[in-house]
């Protein structure tokens, strides 16, 4: 079922957003697909909203459900705007990365603390025009959250 954000009930709000690969949304209980329009165009896929472990989760297939977007073409601004529109305050974004350290084996879970982005020529901010673009729930502070102790 597809629901326009304008017609949604507050129970579709989610506290955690997940940008992931296709198929994850199948883990959500009672998932409902929501299509959201943003000032940046549509997000990469409809957002599946459901419950996992007692929490409301919003899942978006980062590259589209049929892998419609190459990594450098993912509409990240639309993806983030859509999540903020749903009330999401925390994002989990698992991804595949490589390592030059032989002690880190394929399939192991790591939390990266460095990112080298060698791409160029794409937008990388919401603030291209002015200091305040009015993103839902936005503020100007950078927030860091401890992943694990």
What is each stretch, according to the model?
Residues 1-143:
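Metabolite-binding pocket within alpha/beta catalytic cores that recognizes anionic/polar moieties
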Residues 143-149:
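Short, intrinsically disordered, charge-balanced linker/junction segments flanking boundaries
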């Amino acid at each position: 079922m597809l629901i326009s954000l304008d017609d949604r009930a507050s129970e579709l709000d989610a506290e955690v957003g997940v940008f992931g690969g296709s198929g994850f949304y199948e883990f959500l209980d009672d998932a409902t697909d929501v299509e959201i329009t943003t000032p940046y165009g549509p997000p990469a896929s409809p957002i599946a909203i459901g419950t996992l472990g007692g929490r409301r989760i919003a899942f978006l297939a980062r590259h589209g459900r049929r892998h419609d977007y190459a990594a450098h073409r993912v509409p990240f601004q639309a993806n983030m705007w859509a999540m903020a529109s749903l009330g999401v305050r925390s994002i989990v974004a698992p991804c595949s990365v490589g390592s030059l350290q032989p002690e880190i084996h394929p399939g192991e879970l790591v939390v990266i603390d460095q990112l080298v982005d060698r791409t160029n020529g794409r937008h990388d901010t919401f603030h291209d025009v002015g200091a305040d673009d009015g993103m839902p729930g936005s503020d100007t502070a950078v927030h860091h959250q401890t992943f694990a102790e």
